[in-house]
Amino acid sequence: EKAPLPLMINKNITIEGSSGKLPTDVDADGLVVRAPIQLGANVTFKNIKLQLVPQVVLGAGGRQNILGAQSPMAATIFAAGNTLTLDNVNTKVGTNSLQDKDRPYISGGTYKNNGTLGKKSIINIINPNSQTKFAAIYAGDYWNDRNIDVEINLNSSVLNNKIYTGGFSKKLTGNVSVRLGDKSNIYSFDKTNHSGNLNVTVDKDSYMDNLDINGIDELTLDENAKVILKKGSDLN
């Protein structure tokens, strides 16, 4: 496998657009990365267009696909036990509507055990714009079992409308807390590969329709929050 090594960010830093243009403008300040990103410290991306370009594996996908096949999960930001903040970030790759689903993944773990895992992964997705979207969010790791708590504060869209509170194929042991804002579109939580409590808070003035609360240990509604439960869902 010749996957690119991740871009390692090893100091507390804010990477922010400085032109004053909106992240959704065609000529917005932007960062294009053709590799995963891994945190080694607390990092904020703010007022910027962040394009994580999916890796193309040459020869994959059969003879008919001579250009190869995409490996979309290569476009992942790994929090690695640090605080990741995405503040008013446009995640769209390119300008073609066919690329609308080419969005970054987020993991609370590390890239193939690279770097050092911190004590707690905190993922903040705040002040969304119309192009603040993510392919999927995994609290856990892709390649290793982890013992770590994870906090996810989500106020944006996720393409599959769910949060994975474990790893992709490995176990996460630890508590996961999730806060859903009024711009989030989460309907369920997948606790596969997760051992620990799942506590969910719906932010004030937020409305959640058809929420499946199966697997949730504690559900909190802030002021003026409203939730309509999916039929048959059951709070533990």
Residue positions per predicted region:
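All-beta strand scaffolds that present successive hydrophobic residues in beta-strands
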Residues: 14-17, 39, 43-47, 58, ...
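Acidic glycine-/aspartate-rich tracts in secreted/extracellular proteins
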Residues: 19-22
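Right-handed parallel beta-helix/beta-solenoid
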Residues: 38-42, 78-83, 108-118, 138-147, ...
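Extracellular beta-strand-rich solenoid/capping regions of secreted or surface-exposed proteins
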Residues: 2-14, 24-85, 111-114
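Short glycine/acidic-rich loop motifs that flank beta-strands on beta-rich extracellular proteins
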Residues: 25-27, 53-61, 73-74, 92-105, ...
